[in-house]
Amino acid sequence: GTFTSSGILTINRIARWNGSVWAELEEGANSTVRVVTLAGTNLYVGGSFSSVGTQSAYGLAYRSGSSWNSVAGGTSNGVNNLITSLAYYNNELYIGGLFTRVGNIVANGLAKWNGTSWSTFGNTIPGTVIYRLFVNSSDLYVGGFFTTMGGINARNLARWNGTAWSAFGA
């Protein structure tokens, strides 16, 4: 979030509940954290920050054990605008937001990270803004501001089955 304290403790935008009190996670983030998700044993955070803890991490970072890590090397491979949603689907991290680039690729609001590299999927068009990603059973649902997804009419809500898009309800 945007919070910087809990009671008398300094907690910069990321906190954990230990069963009785809130505690900071290292030094927190230097700007807004919008979304958090678990992917395996790693805790991923997305937002509009440029560092988490002592790590440069433009818009996306993960916590493994007791340390923060950047995804894809931090600054040179960061996200160029806000991340609004994260989902772990088919052993990959999916990100949605207002961005147009991740790493060195064009990605109009939607991309995935396989642990080694970024890729796009489903042919999003410029102007696509993704606000929410949700995994249900074997499908990834995508909500946002768009009229088509992957060449099909899908006003603001679409379903990805791992290989193809369909309009919600189809």
Please report, for each region that a protein language model flagged, where it lies by residue:
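Extracytoplasmic surface signature
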Residues: 1-170
